[in-house]
């Protein structure tokens, strides 16, 4: 199932997307939550109600008539991990640094701004953000049930589904503040984009590769800037799985339905890495540029960079 959040007549609603049409799930069955967070909190019962409603009902809304927003518009938290070895090793090598051995010891993550989540469409920035503005091609897992001290062997059961994530980054701000060995902060917290929908795990079964370390999915990942492909990798190349990341995240801490965890940038998944490897020539995102991230099974997330009003 492809779950979405959308705006219609000023209201935010929960829906399911299918072939360009939208099911208004709450309208089909009043027992289904009318927003994504409550839907996820309802767990398997809500999912089964939604599946039954879609079987009995029909989509009544054209996707062209509504505004898609972040599938989880008000997440309790957003964490971003650092799970792809190629990206980490290449980015360090480009700065004349050896691969950091601690990468193989623990899956690391940071918190970003859970009040600055965007979906499809315009992405507003201020002038200082445009100083080496970068995209980051990532996949995000959405937590489907609460837990604490979760083992790797159990962690995949806590994932409701996946969506595309663009962790946009202002590199000049980021590099300045991280010299202080704390962060990232202003280089990241102005926003990330997610979407276009939250895909439940059952739709991704054909791509799944299970192991003792947790599930991986053989999904091609691509990034396009102004319709020109600049990046490509595969989701299954994650060195650390989401299951391992969740074990680390949940140690001594509760996680909640709707929490978002990003994979971190995939190999070649940003201009910082591409420019350093001389694949691109000092290319960054500019005002008016369109960036599209595409992952097999998860769709395409497209954003246009615009100047924030005021």
Please describe what each predicted stretch is.
Residues 252-262:
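Beta-rich strand-turn-strand
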Residues 1-108, 114, 290, 294:
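N-terminal non-catalytic cap/leader segment that marks the start of a structured domain
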Residues 66, 135-137, 217-219, 289, ...:
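Residues at beta-strand starts and edge strands
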Residues 61-62, 121-124, 274-276:
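Short gly/ser/thr-rich secondary-structure transition/capping motifs
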Residues 75-246, 252, 282, 309-310:
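Glycine-enriched loop-and-adjacent helix/strand subsegments that border the catalytic/binding cleft
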């Amino acid at each position: 199932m492809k779950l979405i959040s959308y705006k219609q007549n000023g209201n935010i609603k929960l829906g399911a997307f299918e072939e360009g049409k939208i099911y208004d799930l709450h309208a089909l069955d009043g027992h289904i939550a009318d927003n994504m967070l409550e839907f996820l909190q309802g767990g398997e019962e809500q999912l089964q109600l939604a599946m039954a409603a879609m079987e009995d009902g029909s989509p009544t809304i054209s996707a062209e008539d509504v505004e898609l927003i972040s599938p989880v518009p008000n997440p309790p938290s957003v964490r971003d991990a650092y799970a792809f070895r190629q990206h980490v090793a290449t980015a360090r090598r480009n700065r004349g640094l050896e691969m950091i051995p601690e990468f193989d010891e623990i899956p690391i993550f940071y918190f970003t701004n859970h009040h600055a989540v965007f979906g499809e469409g315009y992405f507003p920035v201020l002038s200082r953000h445009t100083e080496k503005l970068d995209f980051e091609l990532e996949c995000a897992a959405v937590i489907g049930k609460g837990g604490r001290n979760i083992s790797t062997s159990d962690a995949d059961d806590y994932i409701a589904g996946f969506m595309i994530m663009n962790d946009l980054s202002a590199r000049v701000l980021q590099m300045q503040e991280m010299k202080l060995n704390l962060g990232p902060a202003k280089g990241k917290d102005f926003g990330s984009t997610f979407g276009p929908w939250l895909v439940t795990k059952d739709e991704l079964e054909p791509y799944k590769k299970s192991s003792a370390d947790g599930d991986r999915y053989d999904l091609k990942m691509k990034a396009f800037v102004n319709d020109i492909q600049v990046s490509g990798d595969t989701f299954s190349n994650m060195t650390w799985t989401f299951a391992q990341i969740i074990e680390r995240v949940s140690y001594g801490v509760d996680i909640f339905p709707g929490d978002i965890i990003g994979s971190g940038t995939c190999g070649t998944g940003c201009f910082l890495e591409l420019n350093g490897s001389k694949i691109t020539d000092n290319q960054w995102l500019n005002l008016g540029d369109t960036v599209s991230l595409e992952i097999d099974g998860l769709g395409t997330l497209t954003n246009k960079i615009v100047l924030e009003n005021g």
